[in-house]
Amino acid sequence: MRKTLKRAAALLSAATLALSLAACGTPASSETSSESSASATAAPASTAAPEASDASTSTGTPKYIFLFIGDGMSYPQIQSTNYYLSALENGTSMGGDGAILEHEDALSFIDFPVAGSAQTYDSTSFCPDSASTATSISTGHKTYSGTINMDETGTVSYETIAEKLKDQLGYKIGVVSSVNLNHATPAAFYCHQVSRNSYYEIGLEMIESEFDYFAGGALLQPTGAEEDQDDLYELAADAGYTVARTQADAEALGADSGKAVVISEQLADGDSIPYELDREEGTWALSDYVSKGIEMLEGDDGFFMMVEGGKIDWACHANDAGSTLADTEALSDAVDVAIDFYNEHPDETLILVTGDHETGGLTIGYAGTNYDTFLQNLSNQKISYAKFDTDYVASYKENGTSFEEVLDDVAELFGLTTEEAAGQAAEDGVVTDSADSHPSGVTSGSLVMTDYELDLLEDAYNMTMTKTDETELSQEEYILYGSYEPLSVTITHILNNKSGIDFSSYSHTGLPVAVYAMGAGQELFEGYYDNTDIYFNLAELTGVE
């Protein structure tokens, strides 16, 4: 359900200031920060603030700052999720003027009063990674892929916006992620490492940061890569953190609990929070960790909270559109919590929603469906690819399950069926086709697999049942399966394509990311700019140096 936004005061203030500036003949652009010029690296970035920067003081300095980062989330993930939600609500992904933006279940941030775009390249590639892009967002500097908050030489470290807000202004700091707390994006707000894979060292820096609230997935390598180091959780407790590893313990935390590390009681692939499709009823969603963070951080000193929807990226790497859309919606639900807080403190709160890069090369449109989409088909997917791997594929391998038996599970869990099974379902009165309405191509929305698709699935089944860790994939096999379980990724590929969407990669792409802003200083984030400017805009708004 969408939240009502109290935006009138902010918009009126911005308009009043704009008129005043016009009357006074004030220049549209502001002088570039001196720190901006110091950020030049082997791949120089544009660090000039957008023209709207002159309006940055229109609503004052934000006392409460929320920075939501959808890892791997760019325009395709946002738009496909919003279209999908519209299709579920209206029976079609189309509608009248503004219907996609205005429908009741639209993403909570999609019509924030200010929207911008940020380019994402790093010093290595136009297709950057999370370590370097999060470094750009948190410090205003470009660096190599895989490096966190250090320069290309690995000798100069950069102080993050979170560290500066804590040290210079006394803000409380929260870091929340649906993946591991020492993964690249959350780490980029508190650590400084040449390699994002130095998980134990990153964990040590997490403890040394003395940030107030960490919440999300478990720490990777908590006793070191060789499992011979002091346990990070014990070190955190020794440093004064309350380590909550059950939901009951997390629920018991409050404003007077002091520093806390909260680990999801229900852990899934890679010791992360489960995909939203797999989350058990009654267990915390990303939004619940944000709610608890507000409870623990709110106070006279102000706070900064970074919230990462990290499983969006993981789902896109695996080309799992159903999980991608569900986790993008989960991020939107977390933003809803911040909107509720904003509505209580509209003059003191800034909410930013962005991505670090795009993952997977997701597209709305597929050659096999021409101009049509059948997005409701994705609602037939009941679990993520990861849960299918652990709960089903592992059993298939162990028990030698036949292809015919596997097809029964595919129909139950993903809606994909054979012509024979679909005929029986029709006799039983079961309807599985998309209800999206289109002027043509209705039959192409069917969930009945063609002979071509069925052959692809059987080939993938055979590969899954016979391959070992030593199996080397051919170029053709890699393009078909990437590094994923052939059966699982082929199922999601077929369902994606029958829904009218597709992926072009198992890696990151070079698309710009959206930046949505609402609240104090929102005008700074309008326009097209570099991702480093997100840092410089926050620094300008808060006055940190």
Regions found by a protein language model. Give the residues of each.
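Bacterial signal peptide processing site
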Residues: 25-28
